[in-house]
Curated annotation (Swiss-Prot):
Signal peptide: none annotated. Catalyzes the hydrolysis of N-succinyl-L,L-diaminopimelic acid (SDAP), forming succinate and LL-2,6-diaminopimelate (DAP), an intermediate involved in the bacterial biosynthesis of lysine and meso-diaminopimelic acid, an essential component of bacterial cell walls. This is Succinyl-diaminopimelate desuccinylase. CDD domains: M20_DapE_proteobac. It catalyses: N-succinyl-(2S,6S)-2,6-diaminopimelate + H2O = (2S,6S)-2,6-diaminopimelate + succinate. One of its GO terms (molecular function) is succinyl-diaminopimelate desuccinylase activity. The gene is dapE. InterPro entries: ArgE/DapE_CS, Bact_exopeptidase_dim_dom, DapE_proteobac, Peptidase_M20, Peptidase_M20_dimer, Peptidase_M20A.
């Protein structure tokens, strides 16, 4: 089947995280000339497809996920019965990211690769906790000395049109919980209470929206963003016993968890508080002079006639795991204007260009 037909079939699988619904088997059958390794960990299904072309040379991999977020209510059609209409295909996962998966499957089928090995790393655990997916496959590959040299993750990176954005890194994510302790009491006797809201009020302006670093050419500043704050019992005559606050920092490599800890401790000095911090993902950056960045840039410009912005914007992705294992990685895919949305759709023209970009990359790597 051709690329569009393959995409439409792939979109029919109701592969809501972490259930692949048979999508991984379907892909393995399409690439029957590749070795297939089904790698399962803690009930999560993953698939490594790999093909050796020669003994010496470079190993290029593509990464992606077949799982999707739930469709929810309000769709014009069944979210898992793809509809082609006015140049678009409508279905859950059309942009995020079954179009990317279908594009690199088509590319590896049709491209003339001159390197040593091509691999496809696929998971059904990206939209969830993403602990036993791509990371588990890379761990398996490392144990067998099979790690790729370079990788492309086909996440939907473009903003307004195909070719306008390549991701060369991602910010990390640090989650924080702050508890300010007080002493509950009657509102008419504030002198007998310790009001944590009053105590914390001067500190709030030092925390909310604070930039922990100035940013760089590749990364925006690491900003403290408050996501939740609450205290009291929703009554007007009792002061709160404590104040609870949650925040997140999307951090660049210039700001660490220890930097966040030091700053919060400094501004909260003198308060009775507890701080809990957790790094949920690490920041990474692939140098713009690296071969994978240069070759991807060349292929994107050649096929789309756009000059892409090389950036690190957005949330986290499985590309961070490739970077953690020393693999030089970039991300490129279709536009992301409808990801996780009702009536998610992908432009057929964009998808066809993505197939050509990946084919050109493989043939000129």
């Amino acid at each position: 089947m051709n690329a569009k037909e393959f995409l439409i079939e792939l979109l029919k699988f109701k592969s809501v995280t972490p259930n692949d619904d048979g999508a991984l088997n379907f892909i393995a059958m399409e690439l029957s000339d590749f070795e297939a390794f089904f790698i399962e960990k803690e009930g999560i299904k993953n698939l490594l497809l790999t093909k050796k072309f020669k003994d010496e040379g470079e190993h290029l991999a593509f990464g992606g996920h077949v799982d999707v977020v739930p469709a929810g209510e309000g769709w014009s059609n069944n979210a898992f019965a793809p509809v082609e209409k006015e140049g678009f295909i409508y279905a859950r996962g059309a942009q995020d990211m079954k179009s990317g998966v279908a594009a690199f499957v088509d590319a590896v089928k049709n491209a003339d690769f001159k390197g040593a090995r091509l691999s496809l790393i696929l998971t059904s655990d990206e939209e969830g906790e993403a602990i036993y997916g791509t990371k588990a496959v890379l761990e398996w590959m490392q144990e067998r000395d099979m790690l790729p040299d370079y990788a492309v993750v086909a996440e939907p990176t473009c903003v307004k049109k195909i070719g306008d954005s390549i991701k060369i890194g991602r910010r990390g994510s640090i989650n924080g919980k702050l508890l300010i302790r007080g002493k509950q009491g009657h509102v008419a006797y504030p002198e007998k209470c310790i009001n944590p809201v009053h105590d914390f009020a001067p500190v709030l302006k030092l925390l909310a929206g604070f930039d922990l670093d100035p940013g760089s050419a590749e990364f925006s500043p690491s900003k403290i963003v408050i996501t939740d704050i609450r205290g009291g019992m929703e009554v007007c005559n009792v002061t709160p016993n404590d104040l609870k606050l949650m925040f997140n920092v999307r951090n660049s490599p210039d700001t660490s968890l220890e930097d966040v800890k030091s700053y919060v401790e400094k501004i909260c000095h003198g308060l009775n508080y507890e701080l809990e911090l957790k790094q949920s993902s690490e920041a990474f950056l692939t140098n713009i002079d690296n071969k994978i960045v240069q070759k991807m840039n060349e292929s994107v410009q050649k096929i789309t006639h756009e000059v892409p912005e090389l950036n690190t914007k957005g949330g986290t992705s499985d590309a961070r795991y490739f970077a953690k294992y020393g693999v030089k990685v970039v991300e490129f895919g279709v536009c992301n204007d409808r990801i996780h949305a009702i009536d998610e759709r992908v432009s057929i023209e964009e998808f066809e260009k993505l197939c050509l970009v990946f084919k050109d990359l493989i043939e000129n790597f």
